[in-house]
């Protein structure tokens, strides 16, 4: 076990040294050069581990295959993690700090003023005695999703080194998951699986197979500028129109006031001037019928606004779907959930089924017909300078991946 932990830790520390922060404004993938550098590094490691069909596409998608070594394990399972880190926080020059046998209380991050406190993060009380990996307070850590990469790679290493019986295994590492481009160039024809798992969750025990239905709405207001001293009956202020329009949304139907399986509208961007304004809304709901109602609500609100204002330039609205709830696909492959549950229980873990209040690469794969639930990594506080992961949680993820691959003993 200690040998596995040392390997796991070293892999993780190696991977977070790559600056793979994705760029929100990018129209191509990979959106950052560091992702391709990490992809090529992983390609070499996979070859050294003895995997077959190891490929890296021009879009930095890494795929590899490990054939079954047991005649009774003929099915194929995929494991997926993403290369990039969030654009919300710097991922350059990450300096991890390893805290062995955490004794509780505040954790100072580096030499600055940043710290992590159980007052703000009560889950820290559950981590006393664990080995924590934290940041120096200037960057994110990159456990999302390099912990997942390290866990998959370590599991492959253990399977090979100890000759543990396993099914056919497909592995993929994808770019730009954080900006929604992760599956855009995914070579699905080169990744034939009965089902797959993303290793991209949070605390130990998380098993996620429901996510938001998601769409974005772009609403455009056109105004007419003129000198404000002579503006009576002439000026049309697009900024004022946009503010008034936004007041038509339900006040409590927002991210900061919803949880669980509750959906929301989220004003994500407001940009422009007197002559033109664009509002960007995120539309989210788990229930397909309610999701359709939310999109209809916005169209109706625009129609009503245009009717009441009699504008020369009517408000324009374009709504585009982003991804769907993966449960519509996963429910048809119940063994994907049953196997993950059994593997966790065999590792002494109580499965925690919870909805994803977001999306994953698995949601996009589900649209293509591949069931792909999400499994924990052992990390917390993703996308922030307070991000951390426990070495013990990562080791549990390795054990679960191995158990899933070696499902004949479950």
Predicted regions span which residues?
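Active-site metal-coordination/substrate-binding segment of hydrolases
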Residues: 73-168
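A non-catalytic alpha/beta surface segment that caps or lines the substrate-entry region
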Residues: 27-74, 78-80, 84, 95
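Short helix-loop-beta-strand segments that form the rim/entrance of peptidase-like active sites
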Residues: 157-179, 259-260
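N-terminal capping segment at the start of a domain
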Residues: 5-33, 134, 323, 380-384
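Short, conserved micro-motifs enriched in small and acidic residues
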Residues: 33, 139-150, 232-240, 388-395
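Midchain, well-structured core segments that form catalytic/ion-binding scaffolds
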Residues: 116, 124, 130-143, 175-299, ...
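Metal-dependent amide/peptide-bond hydrolase catalytic core
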Residues: 239-410
């Amino acid at each position: 076990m200690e040998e596995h932990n040392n390997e796991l830790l070293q892999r993780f520390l190696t991977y977070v040294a790559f600056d793979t922060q994705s760029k929100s404004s990018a129209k191509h993938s990979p959106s950052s050069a560091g992702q391709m550098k990490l992809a090529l590094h992983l390609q070499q490691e996979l070859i050294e581990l003895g995997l077959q069909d190891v490929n890296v596409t021009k879009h930095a998608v890494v795929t590899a295959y490990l054939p079954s070594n047991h005649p009774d394990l003929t099915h194929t399972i995929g494991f997926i993690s993403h290369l990039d880190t969030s654009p919300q926080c710097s991922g350059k020059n990450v300096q991890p700090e390893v805290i062995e046998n955490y004794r509780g209380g505040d954790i100072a991050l580096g030499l600055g003023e940043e710290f992590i406190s159980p007052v703000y993060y009560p889950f820290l009380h559950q981590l006393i005695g664990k080995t924590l990996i934290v940041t120096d307070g200037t960057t994110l850590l990159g456990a999302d999703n390099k912990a997942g990469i390290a866990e998959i790679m370590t599991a492959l290493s253990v399977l090979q080194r100890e000759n543990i019986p396993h099914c056919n295994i497909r592995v993929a590492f994808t770019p730009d998951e954080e900006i929604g481009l992760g599956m855009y160039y995914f070579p699905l024809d080169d990744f034939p699986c009965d089902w797959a798992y993303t290793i991209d969750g949070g605390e130990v025990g998380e098993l996620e197979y429901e996510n938001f239905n998601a769409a974005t709405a772009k609403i455009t207001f056109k105004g007419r500028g003129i000198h404000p001293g002579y503006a009576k009956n002439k000026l049309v202020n697009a900024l004022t129109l946009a503010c008034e329009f936004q007041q038509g949304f339900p006040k409590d139907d927002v991210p900061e006031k919803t949880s669980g399986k509750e959906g929301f509208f989220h004003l994500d961007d407001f940009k422009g001037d007197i002559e033109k304004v664009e509002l960007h809304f995120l539309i989210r709901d788990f229930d397909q019928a309610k999701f359709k109602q939310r999109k209809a609500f916005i169209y109706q609100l625009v129609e009503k606004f245009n009717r009441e204002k009699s504008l020369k330039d009517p408000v324009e609205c374009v709504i585009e779907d982003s991804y769907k709830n993966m449960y519509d696909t996963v429910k048809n492959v119940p063994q994907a959930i049953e196997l993950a549950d059994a593997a966790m229980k065999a590792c002494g873990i109580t499965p925690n089924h919870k909805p994803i209040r977001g999306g994953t690469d698995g949601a996009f794969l589900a649209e293509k017909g591949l069931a792909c639930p999400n499994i924990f990594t052992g990390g917390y506080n993703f996308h922030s300078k307070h991000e951390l992961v426990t070495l013990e949680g990562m080791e549990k993820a390795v054990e679960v991946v191995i158990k899933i691959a070696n499902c004949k003993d479950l």
